[in-house]
Amino acid sequence: LSAKYDLKSLVMSKEWTWDKFREVLRDSTFDTNGDGKTDIWGLSGQGYQFSVITQALGYANNAPATRKEGDGVKIIMNEAPYLDTLEFMHTLTWEDKVISTEEKWRAYDSFNLFAQGGSMFWIGTNWWVQTLKTMVDDTVFSVLPVPIGPNAGGEYTVYIPATNHTFGMPSTCENRKEAGMVFEYWMKNCPKDDRGVRASWTDKVFDTESLDVIEMLSKLPYTFDWSAPNTTTYTTVSLGEHGIPDRTPPATFVASVLDSLQAEADQLWSLADLS
């Protein structure tokens, strides 16, 4: 894979797009023994894969599920960017078959799949870095942004500090205890010109190219807003499988939840004291 793709160059030149990501995932999915079953998946996700991966791709596509409008919130899952995100997930899952549908993974399960070499890429957050270090000997990993979606204006997005990013390609490292800590440091501290600390990581971490990527990510503006309603229905939908395992068409899935989500959001905002 590394011989075919210069992933760092793709990232830094902002050519790390959904189309390129899809191509790489297809080249990263293998039936290693010819028995007709996939042994190495292109992608796994933290927690229930169809929740975390979909959310991460949505952020990367500038496709929020909600938007603040006047004194309330509008559910906008029926707009093109969000529907396009769900459609892309369907393509990766059912057409390309690069995401496993065999397990409803818990967070640890999907992480373990990646850590043990069962998937080439994993989408997750920085607080799992320490877990990775304790699970696999002699491992370091690359850090890549979630790829740029077609509605993102050609730019990477970071929803909140240390939010979802793509971790990929385990490789060997002599200093396994230090592997991956660079990501935690940069995303938590966001240094503007901390060359001394960077130099110390360069000495310890095998995959030094990730330092450039991490530093770039740490300086991106955050896109977080406060419009997502903290309601039972919204939480259930956002942390759910988005109809993907059942092959429910995106527009059909959204239509099935839109009215209830909007009604609950309207009720929540009607109780808010906006004076």
What are these regions (language model features)?
Residues 1-11:
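Aromatic-glycine-rich donor-binding/catalytic loop that engages nucleotide-sugar donors
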Residues 2, 14-74:
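Extracytoplasmic/periplasmic solute-binding protein
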Residues 11-14, 41, 63-84, 149-158:
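Short, solvent-exposed loop/beta-turn-alpha elements that line the ligand-binding surface or hinge
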Residues 18, 22-27, 64-104:
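Glycine-centered hinge/linker elements that transmit conformational signals in sensory
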Residues 22-27, 107-122:
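Short helices/loops that flank or line small-molecule/ion binding pockets
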Residues 120-125, 142:
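Paired acidic/hydrophobic, glycine-rich loop segments that form the ligand-binding mouth/hinge
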Residues 134-203:
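Extracytoplasmic/periplasmic substrate-recognition and gating elements
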Residues 171-180, 188-275:
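Conserved C-terminal helix/tail region of periplasmic/extracytoplasmic solute-binding proteins
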